[in-house]
């Protein structure tokens, strides 16, 4: 199989082919996901909750992400590897440049940042210096305390328009991918149709170009709160690789996410 690049994902979008993404944190799981055909792997700051046992993602450090990026890189041959920029690691463009460089040197193909208009200068600076950027809008977990919890975003007209405007601005600033999380399905589809770059959804309906889930949710091994938008594929298959194949199949056929995993 050919390596997945941002150009591959753009081609998928242009052809109307849905693609899949999962979080990964070590070489063994990454190798399994890669060999089964998951297109994008994310070393997510979700590790703060699913690996480290915290209540949110805020305690995760750049060093944590870099370590797990190196682990995942050793396990993959095909998938595009994105690494999260953790909380307060990109508060200024200069800080973002330093920390993004560390993650790229650890093996990432792209870095992901959460935020809207305030990030435009940073996105442009990174991309102009050879660091591809994936933006993230909607429910941005690093802002959980600003939102007052993990809540659906963009339900009212003003916030929906703001998210759409920010998506367009981030694309213009140079972002090559966009993740939208926990927003109404109709808004996510509008954003996907308005942008040239691929849009990946999580809790955002089936109208996006790709889907991403946390691996612990897909395999039913998350402790504590289980998000409504997640689905335990291991429960219905009984084997990890079969679970991953089922996830890929349902995304490509438009079966997942269904109404049970979507917000209005």
From Swiss-Prot:
Disulfide bonds: none annotated. The active site is at 181 (proton acceptor). Its cofactor is Mg(2+). GO terms for cellular component: cytoplasm. One of its GO terms (molecular function) is 3-methyl-2-oxobutanoate hydroxymethyltransferase activity. It catalyses: 3-methyl-2-oxobutanoate + (6R)-5,10-methylene-5,6,7,8-tetrahydrofolate + H2O = 2-dehydropantoate + (6S)-5,6,7,8-tetrahydrofolate. Its EC number is 2.1.2.11. Binds 1 Mg(2+) ion per subunit. InterPro entries: Pantoate_hydroxy_MeTrfase, Pyrv/PenolPyrv_kinase-like_dom, Pyrv_kinase-like_dom_sf. Catalyzes the reversible reaction in which hydroxymethyl group from 5,10-methylenetetrahydrofolate is transferred onto alpha-ketoisovalerate to form ketopantoate. Homodecamer; pentamer of dimers. This is 3-methyl-2-oxobutanoate hydroxymethyltransferase. It comes from Shewanella woodyi (strain ATCC 51908 / MS32).
């Amino acid at each position: 199989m050919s390596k997945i690049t941002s150009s591959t994902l753009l081609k998928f979008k242009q052809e109307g082919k849905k693609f899949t993404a999962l979080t990964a944190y070590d070489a063994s799981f990454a190798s399994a996901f890669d060999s089964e055909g998951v297109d994008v792997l994310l070393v997510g700051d979700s590790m703060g909750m699913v690996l480290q046992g915290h209540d949110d993602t805020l305690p995760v450090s750049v060093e944590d992400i870099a370590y797990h990026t190196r682990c995942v890189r050793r396990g993959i041959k095909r998938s595009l590897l994105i690494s999260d920029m953790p909380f307060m690691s990109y508060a200024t463009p200069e800080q973002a440049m330093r920390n993004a460089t560390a993650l790229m040197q650890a093996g990432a193909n792209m870095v992901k940042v959460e935020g809207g208009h305030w990030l435009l200068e940073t996105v442009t600076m990174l991309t102009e210096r050879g660091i591809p950027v994936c933006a993230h809008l909607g429910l941005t977990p690093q802002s959980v305390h600003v939102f007052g919890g993990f809540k659906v975003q963009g339900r009212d007209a003003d916030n929906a328009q703001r998210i759409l405007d920010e998506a367009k601005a981030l694309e213009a600033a140079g972002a090559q991918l966009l993740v939208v999380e926990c927003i109404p399905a109709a808004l996510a589809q509008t954003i996907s149709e308005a942008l040239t770059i691929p849009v990946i959804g999580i809790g955002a309906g089936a109208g996006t170009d790709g889907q991403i889930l946390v691996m612990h949710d897909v395999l039913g091994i998350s402790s504590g709160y289980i998000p409504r938008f997640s689905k335990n594929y291991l429960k219905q298959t009984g084997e990890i690789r079969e679970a991953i194949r089922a996830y890929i199949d349902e995304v490509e056929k438009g079966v997942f996410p269904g109404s049970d995993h979507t917000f209005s």
